[in-house]
């Protein structure tokens, strides 16, 4: 170990150990990067906040080798519906089969339980991933070589310092990290206060497994089955109502009774109050310090994407940081983090606002009809934005992005076979690096000498995807057993695509397979 390496206590410090922080720590440790986490609280926040995850998030968990463990503590979600109190259904979103190698497409969660499972997985990395509980970060001092992190023990008041190369601030909506880098959080906070009521289920009732949005101007309600035998209602307080009006279970029960929920159905477990925020940080980076999750963006809950957006931030930043720290990528790669993640966070924020207008009956019938209208003439099969597979809007890609382009899309994940007859999900056979996939062609044959040298420098693999009715020809060939990959490439007229470690398509032969600038 060199003198320079000995000067660091860890490669990366993560401030905050909620879902975003633990996802960042897991992503880094999985890539062999040392992490120290500073978490102010000693215990997991006991109230459920996020209520759902989808197949994109589960694919991230798969990349970390923990998806099967997470699946054991979450439950499938049936569908989404928007209804009025007289029983009129305004809109429904069914969940079609996932293209990302996960079944089903959406899951209900109970956040404290899932969060504990994530922390248990992180705990298996030993000294590579060290967590300091009860440690409040009070100062960050960065220079050209790293960051000095000062934390205060909440119990003893003792100050400690750690020297790291980079810092990820994942310390939530009230982020101190954000303040330490003089970052503003622009946007709005709505005046309306909501009560969140978490209950233990005592018996099943009809259609409990729908995620139901009760649409009403005065009392719109989110009604959702959580995992582990829990159920939640989110209800706005009326003008003049305050927290003091709901200080006991006896005062809370009338809110549930109005929807026909009785003590035979559930037992009230806990309740809390909050307001909806629509805010985003003006920058997500200052030198060696990055923001992720709620520290960078806050959105209303209507799209179920707040926590998931943070987890996706963590993966995007984590795989890039790991490769920069290992010397495999230039530090300029870190500029792509915000360029790629900010548009996606803005998309889900806007979608949440739009869906909220339906729930609160602020959307006109014409607007609702437009939301339910399927556009014509698309190359990509239409799916409602809430459930459609993700697409990059920019960043480290080459070529046009849009309906008719494969660039920026997440490659589907069917079951494939290798030359030895092994069958597995695509990602499990591709590994975690850059890969060029050819449609029944060796992608190397489509590259110039300089292009191949550039991909070689990134450690890329070259894989031909063969039809299941043909022979494999090379040691790295894969067979499209589910007949998904080859038709997907053909839809966009692509003979070969370059796939990033996060499974987004960076380039295609149509616009050129050169490494994106």
Stretches found by the model and what they are:
Residues 2-11, 15, 30-31, 84-87, ...:
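Helical substrate-recognition/capping region of FAD-dependent monooxygenase/halogenase enzymes
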Residues 8-10, 156-166:
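Core beta-strand elements of the Rossmann-like FAD/NAD(P) dinucleotide-binding domain
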Residues 21-22:
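N-terminal Rossmann-fold NAD(P) dinucleotide-binding loop
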Residues 29-49:
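Glycine-rich FAD pyrophosphate-binding loop
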Residues 49, 54-125:
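Active-site-adjacent segment of FAD-dependent monooxygenases/related oxidoreductases
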Residues 72, 119-120, 166, 170-276:
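Conserved FAD-binding catalytic core of PHBH/FMO-like flavoproteins
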Residues 133-147:
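A conserved short coil-to-beta-strand element within the FAD-binding core of flavoproteins
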Residues 245-309, 329, 344, 348-351:
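FAD/FMN-dependent oxidoreductases across multiple families
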């Amino acid at each position: 170990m060199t003198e320079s390496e000995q000067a660091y206590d860890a490669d990366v410090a993560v401030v905050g150990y909620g879902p975003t922080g633990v996802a960042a720590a897991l992503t880094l440790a999985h890539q062999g990067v040392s992490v120290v986490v500073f978490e102010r609280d000693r215990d997991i926040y006991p109230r459920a906040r996020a209520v759902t995850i989808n197949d994109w998030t589960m694919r991230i968990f798969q990349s970390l080798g923990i998806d099967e463990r997470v699946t054991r503590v979450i439950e499938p979600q049936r569908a989404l519906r928007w209804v009025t109190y007289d029983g009129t259904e305004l809109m429904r979103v069914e969940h079609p089969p996932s293209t990302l190698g996960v079944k089903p497409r959406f899951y209900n969660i109970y956040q404290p339980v899932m969060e504990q499972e994530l922390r248990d997985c992180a705990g298996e990395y030993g000294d590579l991933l060290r967590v300091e509980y009860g440690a409040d970060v009070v100062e960050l001092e960065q220079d050209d070589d790293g960051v000095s992190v000062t934390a205060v023990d909440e119990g003893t008041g003792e100050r400690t310092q750690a020297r790291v190369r980079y810092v990820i601030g994942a310390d939530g909506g009230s982020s101190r990290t954000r303040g330490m880098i003089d970052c503003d959080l622009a946007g709005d906070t709505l005046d309306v206060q909501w009560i969140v009521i978490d209950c233990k289920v005592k018996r099943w009732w009809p259609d409990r497994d729908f995620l139901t949005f009760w649409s009403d101007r005065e009392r719109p309600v989110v009604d959702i089955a959580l995992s582990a035998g829990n159920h939640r209602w989110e209800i706005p307080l009326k003008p003049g109502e305050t927290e003091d009006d709901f200080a006991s279970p006896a005062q809370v029960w009338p809110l549930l009774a109005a929807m026909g929920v009785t003590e035979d159905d559930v037992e009230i477990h806990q309740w809390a109050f909050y307001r909806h925020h629509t805010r985003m940080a003006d920058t997500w980076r200052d030198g060696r310090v990055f923001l992720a999750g709620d520290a960078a963006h806050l959105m209303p809950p209507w799209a179920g994407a707040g926590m998931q957006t943070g987890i996706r931030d963590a993966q995007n930043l984590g795989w890039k940081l790991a490769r920069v720290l290992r010397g495999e990528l230039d530090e300029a790669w870190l500029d792509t983090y915000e360029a790629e993640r900010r548009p996606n966070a803005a998309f889900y924020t806007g979608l949440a606002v739009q869906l909220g207008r339906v729930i609160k009956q602020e959307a006109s019938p014409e607007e609702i009809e437009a939301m339910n209208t399927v556009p014509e003439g698309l190359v990509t099969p239409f799916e409602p934005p809430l459930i459609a597979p993700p697409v990059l809007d920019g960043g480290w890609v080459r070529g046009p992005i849009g309906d008719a382009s494969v660039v920026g899309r997440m490659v589907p994940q069917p079951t494939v076979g290798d030359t030895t007859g092994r069958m597995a999900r695509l990602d499990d056979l591709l590994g975690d690096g850059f890969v060029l996939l050819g449609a029944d062609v060796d992608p190397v044959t489509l590259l110039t000498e300089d292009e191949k040298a550039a991909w070689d420098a990134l450690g890329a693999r070259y894989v031909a995807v063969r039809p299941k009715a043909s022979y494999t020809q090379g040691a790295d060939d894969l067979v499209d057993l589910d007949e998904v990959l080859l038709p997907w490439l053909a839809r966009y007229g692509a003979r070969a695509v370059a796939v990033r470690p996060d499974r987004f398509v960076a380039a295609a032969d149509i616009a050129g397979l050169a490494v994106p600038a």
